[in-house]
């Protein structure tokens, strides 16, 4: 199936300016200047932790040097296994030109709130688990199980090194309906609300009972309840049009883990 390459490229190149600052209670001596980075929306905080840790470590007491690093925004600990773009859309929904200010911590890791991903290997394991889950939903796992280890490595390294062509040379196989089918079996989907930083998953087919391709409006109807109605969806900082087809969304707007991560706005009925 022909993909809208310019859309894929636009999503891939989306970045967020982040201003990292140290926890003032952990600083020894002179307060360091903030550390600024432009980071891909598709990346994860553990992939930039080494760079940020290296900058601030000289200002942190020796007892905290080897601590498990974590980050917060305005006191809210950031989930290390969420893509950075998802975190930004949940916590900083109003787009502006100022950097997103995050605080890095070297101690007091909130184990009751965060999954500890203190190595790239652990993050890679989590990422591959998500990919396999997504493929089970789309193709009953038939595509990713037919891939070789080198293909899995190419996906991961393409993400880590931000290499569009390297990543999509393999990922395109995961983004096509299986065999002679015209759509995925189900849409890998994670749904977030502004008042809750956890996600829910719902089994959603891209095709209606009558055989028609479902749109975002159909999805919002399925997500609505008698007491509250879904009125809008956003991903990658984009407010989505209700007529957008779910199959197209999954093929073009999914994160590298192959899931659509949607921030959903609700209104009480």
From Swiss-Prot:
Source taxon at top rank: Eukaryota
Keyword Cytoplasm found: yes
GO cellular component, one term: phagophore
Gene3D superfamilies, sorted: 3.10.20.620, Autophagy protein Apg5, helix rich domain, Phosphatidylinositol 3-kinase Catalytic Subunit, Chain A, domain 1
The record's account of how the chain is modified after translation: Conjugated to Atg12, which is essential for autophagy.
Positions of crosslink type Glycyl lysine isopeptide (Lys-Gly) (interchain with G-Cter in ATG12): 132
Subcellular location: Cytoplasm; Preautophagosomal structure membrane
Xref: InterPro entries: Atg5, ATG5_HBR, Atg5_HR, ATG5_UblA, Atg5_UblA_dom_sf, ATG5_UblB
Topology with respect to the bilayer: Peripheral membrane protein
Keywords: Autophagy, Cytoplasm, Isopeptide bond, Membrane, Protein transport, Transport, Ubl conjugation
Biological process terms in GO annotation: aggrephagy; autophagosome assembly; autophagy; cellular response to nitrogen starvation; cellular response to starvation; glycophagy; larval midgut cell programmed cell death; macroautophagy
Coiled coil: none
Predominant subcellular localization, coarse grouping: cytoplasm
One Pfam short name: ATG5_UblB
PANTHER family: AUTOPHAGY PROTEIN 5
Family per similarity comment: Belongs to the ATG5 family.
Primary role: Involved in autophagic vesicle formation. Conjugation with Atg12, through a ubiquitin-like conjugating system involving Atg7 as an E1-like activating enzyme and Atg10 as an E2-like conjugating enzyme, is essential for its function. The Atg12-Atg5 conjugate acts as an E3-like enzyme which is required for lipidation of Atg8 and its association to the vesicle membranes.
Name by which UniProt lists this protein: Autophagy protein 5
Native species: Drosophila melanogaster
Upper taxonomic lineage: Eukaryota, Metazoa, Ecdysozoa, Arthropoda, Hexapoda
Gene: Atg5
